[in-house]
Swiss-Prot record:
Gene3D superfamilies: 3.40.50.2300
Family under the similarity heading: Belongs to the leucine-binding protein family.
Protein name: Leu/Ile/Val-binding protein homolog 7
Taxonomic lineage of the native organism: Bacteria, Pseudomonadati, Pseudomonadota, Alphaproteobacteria, Hyphomicrobiales
Recorded superkingdom: Bacteria
Leader peptide range in chain numbering: 1-22
Keywords noted in UniProt: Amino-acid transport, Signal, Transport
Signal in keyword set: yes
Keyword Mitochondrion (UniProt): no
Residue pairs linked by disulfide bridges in the UniProt entry: none
Function per UniProt: Component of an amino-acid transport system.
């Protein structure tokens, strides 16, 4: 009898106890190894800081967010890792991915599974132009690069060179993945619409080990402005071989990627990259009155990782992830309808985030308020020079 009463008492206690809070798993899908690992890891760091801050304030829908990593070393592995995260880890959503090709591949998997995919850094048009219901992008995309680059050519670079922008001989060179081809396509369109003179448009394999023939082609075309869309290794290779070949155009303009990385400048030499331009997500040498919260992010980053941010990709992922997670905290569940309800309600004006740009998701689930910054390498540092409201320095001519 005594044993029976004890058993009943224990059962009653267990029945009356509140169930333990279950963590919410989210995928963190980036290239953590392979040629894109540096920017992949840098992007993931921003997501990690955002999740830590959200969890410190109670999590999402009362539960802690736990990130589960997936290594998207290439497109095929991105597909395999997305499947694993969904079917084995049972994630409620996937954040990623930095690489456009990997994002396109992996997001198709999540769409078919009905799992939301939140892109925080990849820029290819097709990520959000396919009309997929469960794929959202918080960051600017390929068109925004090209628009800002051509605008800078007309309003800043050509006047500084003492030339009419229509007298410039412009070359477009790009790595041949979704990232490079998307940006280059828009550059060609905007250059044509502006009536500017494009003398060469040429792609190359992203894993190339020799760009000397491309440098010769640029010389032969008489290009005095080069627009390059590239990751880190090909950015370094082009800058090195152009310098070695004595090719010194009046302006080199990168579209993010390797041109936004301090390790790129360190690898080629600060004198080689001096005065090169870069259009990309917000970086750190910027008028912080335009980017509230940026300085606090930098301090959080240094505290967690023991170094300063290596690129603005961490900031971009951080801001996008926080906006999305805070929105999800206002609904119940993570099904397609709940996510749509949460993100459709997001309405943040420009100048209110650490990126400077605002947030509002359009009919394709693209943040239509996302925008780029124009920067230049000066004295070994990447500083903002455009738009004027965000600039901290005037542009310089190469020596």
């Amino acid at each position: 009898m005594e044993k029976h009463l004890i058993a009943l008492s224990v059962a009653a206690l267990l029945a009356g106890a509140a169930p333990a809070s279950a963590d919410i798993k989210m995928g963190s899908l980036y290239p953590f190894s392979g040629p894109l690992a540096l920017l992949g890891d840098e992007s993931a760091r921003g997501l990690e800081i955002a999740v830590e801050e959200i969890n410190a304030k109670g999590g999402v829908q009362g539960e802690k967010i736990v990130l589960v990593r997936g290594d998207a070393v290439d497109n095929n592995q991105a597909i395999g890792e997305a499947r694993r995260l969904i079917s084995v880890e049972n994630v409620a959503g996937i954040f990623g991915t930095f690489s456009s090709g990997r994002a396109v591949a992996a997001s198709q998997v999540s769409e078919l599974a009905g799992v939301p995919y939140f892109e925080l850094g990849a820029v290819a048009d097709e990520i959000t132009d396919r009309g997929l219901e469960n794929v959202y992008r918080a960051n600017p995309y390929a068109r925004d690069f090209a628009q800002m680059i051509v605008e800078m050519l007309q309003k800043k670079i050509a006047p500084k060179l003492g030339k009419d922008s229509k007298d410039l001989k412009i070359a477009v060179i790009y790595e041949d993945s979704s990232y490079g081809t998307s940006v280059a396509k828009h550059e060609e369109t905007f250059l044509k619409e502006a009536g500017l003179n494009m003398v060469l448009s040429q792609s190359y394999p992203g894993n190339t080990v020799d760009m000397s023939s491309l440098v010769l082609d640029l010389k032969s075309a008489g290009a005095d402005v080069v627009l390059q869309t590239s990751y880190q290794s090909d950015s370094v290779l082009f800058l090195q071989q152009a310098n070695e070949g004595g090719y010194k155009p009046s302006a080199i303009v990168g579209a993010g990627g390797g041109y936004s990385l301090q390790p790129t400048a360190d690898a080629v030499g600060h004198d080689v990259i001096e005065a090169a331009y870069d259009v990309d997500f917000t970086q750190f040498a910027v008028n912080t009155s335009f980017t509230p919260g940026l300085e606090e992010f930098v301090e959080a980053y240094k505290k967690k990782y023991g170094e300063t941010p290596r690129s603005g990709h961490s900031l971009t992922n951080y801001v996008g992830a926080k906006v999305i997670l805070e929105a999800l905290n206002k609904v119940k569940g993570f099904d397609a309808a709940a996510v749509k309800q949460a993100l459709s309600a997001v309405d943040i004006e420009a100048g209110k985030t650490a990126m400077g740009y605002g947030f509002k998701f359009d009919q394709n689930n693209q943040n239509e308020r996302a925008s780029m910054m124009g920067m230049q390498w000066q004295d070994g540092k990447l500083v903002t020079v455009y738009p004027d409201a965000a600039a901290i320095s005037e542009i310089r001519l190469p020596q």
